[in-house]
């Protein structure tokens, strides 16, 4: 028997939608006298469970190279909702005599991460080779993105897995539990100098407010999304055609959001919006995009990170509830001195 469950707030920062799930009948709950009943709060990161995630990374750090051959470090990014974004430092040793490294072992590393354990829930997996910078850490998110975006060959280094299983709470895909994944694999010498200033742009109707976010990264505001699920947006394809006329070689990553100011305000906002609101296969567009023997590439990526008509709504604070919690922290109340 199944009954509707939800909506409820989740750890990605949205109200998951109602779905039918099997009913479990509980007849007894046994406990010791004076039992401690653990609970936590979740919502848009960071929340209390953020500390659990940080501790898990610390506990498992030494195990990562043993479980995933060639992988030195992983970072399931809390600000992006954990499962939507996994950063990893891997190895590139397959052809050590080559003049310049290119991603080969890194692809094996990425498929290994997607093939077992909790890392298999990841949606975007971004990998860099330790050989290019022995001091590189994927816990330095801005530094890691800069390293990767300097080295990504966008005609070669994007590897999509389509129509596959997804985290149940991720509504960016084509249906419940189904969507796509992608590997960004970066190795070798830098391919470009990342731009650090905002260029002048001509934008089509509905797109506005271009914002420089970080070296090589640009954010635009787009019109409200109105397409059905599992469908390309003609407006995004038109945007790419127009942007292809501009000199954007220094911007390998362009993000279209509902609110460019909010998205570009901080790394936390950028990561949350970009990676929780996009499906790699459906929402990755590109300047000068092409498909050759089923491999897709471009000269600059454009990620559609707008809220879609089929997404779960974002969590919002309720003033009355916040007031009640604040009152618990007053002198003489249970949470005084704690929060």
What are these model-predicted stretches?
Residues 1-339:
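Charged, compositionally biased interaction regions
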